[in-house]
Amino acid sequence: MPDLLNNLNKRGLIKWGGKQSSDYGIVVQDCPAFDKPRRKQTVFNVAGRNGSVLFQEDAFEDTTRSYNIWIDEQTEEDSGGIETGRLDQRVADFTAWLYSVKGYQELSDNFEPDYYRLAYYSGGNDVSNELITYGKSTLTFTCRPERFLVSGKTPVTVVNGDTMENPTLFVAKPLIHIEGSGNVIIAINGVGMTATIDDYINIDCERMNAYRLPSENMNAYIQ
């Protein structure tokens, strides 16, 4: 709990699209809401039957993450190492950053440093002049429903007979890299999968695709 409280009181920082908010003199005013994604589900009402029939999928809808921000036009020391500049130039640089990046990008902040999301920015921010030298706005990113562990970027080596456990309560869809030759059996929750390999194979569980770089399709070698 103390670590969480310390994170909530930090000077906010966003990282997205290969850059971070402090590069543009952007200050995150407060911790964003911890919005949770909605489960994909369908509710059917049947005449003459009490209640509803519920069909729930093992999938969730996109969610959003919004940041209240200030664009700081103060001194170099006050703005985190950014040279003093006019507010309109700050706004131009800031919006160029947002609009020049396409598609889902890694989004992280220092409020939840152990996690990152995949998010895109679809536009619509209004930056207003407030107190002459400040710009005020809200950034809203559309995010995939998952929160990814930063620790998950570090490869874990597993040898014959070893097991791995998912550290979360949610379904994991890892990227598996197998080196060797012959038939390899991978068991996930008791369900076996056989991969016939020569040298190596990559299995992307998220995209349900087996391949070798640069673009060799290896799905026929998975059973």
Q: What is each of the regions a protein language model found here?
A:
Residues M1-N45:
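Polar/acidic, low-complexity leader/linker segments enriched in S/T/G and N/D
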Residues P2, K136, T140, R144-P145, ...:
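Intrinsic low-complexity, intrinsically disordered or marginally ordered coil/linker segments
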Residues K19-Q29, Y116-S122, M193-D198:
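Short amphipathic beta-strand/extended segments with alternating polar/hydrophobic composition
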Residues F44, S52-I82, T133-R147:
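Oligomerization/assembly interface segments of phage tail-like spikes and tubes
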Residues T64-N110:
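Long, hydrophobic/aromatic-enriched structural stretches that serve as scaffold segments
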Residues S100-R147:
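Short beta-strand and beta-hairpin "edge-sheet" elements
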Residues L149-Q223:
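Intrinsically disordered, low-complexity segments enriched in serine, threonine, and glycine
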